[in-house]
Amino acid sequence: MDKSLFYNPQKMLSYDRILNFVIGARGIGKSYAMKVYPINRFIKYGEQFIYVRRYKPELAKVSNYFNDVAQEFPDHELVVKGRRFYIDGKLAGWAIPLSVWQSEKSNAYPNVSTIVFDEFIREKDNSNYIPNEVSALLNLMDTVFRNRERVRCICLSNAVSVVNPYFLFFNLVPDVNKRFNVYDDALIEIPDSLDFSSERRKTRFGRLIDGTEYGEMSLDNQFIGDSHVFIEKRSKDSKFVFSIVYNGFTLGVWVDVNQGLMYVDTAHDPSTKNVYTLTTDDLNENMMLITNYKNNYHLRKLASAFMNGYLRFDNQVIRNIAYELFRKMRIQ
C-alpha cells in the first residue's frame, strides 16, 4: 500500500502542544509513526524517549518493539534489553507500565523529550483503566519532564470513544468532524483515513470486516463505543434556564417550549443566578447545593425530561457526564 496513505505526525507535532491525543483507524500507522519519530530524534539529537502501556502484561512482548521499524534504519543497530531500548549501543529509551508510576518518582530522565502512551483509550475487552489514571500519567510526565520546555506526550488510540477519563479530566469536548481540535496546552487529532480505508477495503480482510461494527472502527474511524441516542444540537429557539456543575464541568440546560425538548450543552449564561451542584467538592460562591433533586423545581424538570425521553445532549461527552449526574441523583 502507498506510504502516503499512512499516518504522518508532522502536522500534529507542528502545533507544539505538551499533551497530544491521536485517535485513528486501526492499521493506519499511528504506532509505527510514533516509533519512527523518537528513533529519529535520538539518532539526530540524542533525545531519549519513553514508551508507556497501561499494565505490565502489555509489555510482555516489548522485545519485539523494533521489529516492524528496523527496515527504516538499515544503518543502525536497534536492540531491546529488558525494558530498555538501545540504538547503536547507546541507551535511547525505556518501556514503562503506567500502573507502577509511583516507582518512577525517584528516577531522573533529563534527556527524555518524548513520551508515547499507546492504547490510552480502553477497548471493550481489554483491562480496566487504573485508579486515578489521568493523575498517574501527569505524575509520570512531571517526573520525566520537570520544568523543561521542549517536551511532549503523545497518546495513541483506535477510534473507540470520545468519552474517556482524559477528555473528562481536562474538559475536552472534541468536534469529531475536525481533524485537529487544538487547545491551549493540548491537542486532539482525528486523522482522515478515507484514502487508506478505500484501499484497505480492497484487501481480503477489508472485505471481510466491511459493514461490521469492527469495520466501522478499523476502516472508517467511527467511535464504536459511543452511543448516538439522544445526541442532538440544541435548537436556535431554545432558551437558557439554569446551570448545573458536576465534577468541575458546567452544564447549561436549555428549553425549547415549542418542540417540548430540554437540552444539555456546554454553553451557559455565566451571569445566571440559577447554578446548582450536588457535591460539596463542586460548591462555590453563588451556587446552591442540592442534596435531594425532588426539592428543587429545575432539577425535578431535568429529571422528568430524562425519564420521559425528551432530554437531548450536545455530544457524547456531555451525555456521559449527564448520565453520571443522574446516577448521582439516583435516577437509573
UniProtKB/Swiss-Prot annotation:
Binding site for ATP: G24, A25, R26, G27, I28, G29, K30, S31
Enzyme class at the top of the EC tree: hydrolase
Keywords of the record: ATP-binding, Hydrolase, Late protein, Nucleotide-binding, Viral genome packaging, Viral release from host cell
Bilayer-spanning residue ranges: none
Pfam families assigned to the protein according to its UniProt record, in alphabetical order: Podovirus_Gp16
Residue numbers spanned by region ATPase: 1-207
Name the UniProt record assigns to this protein: DNA packaging protein
Source organism (scientific name): Bacillus phage PZA
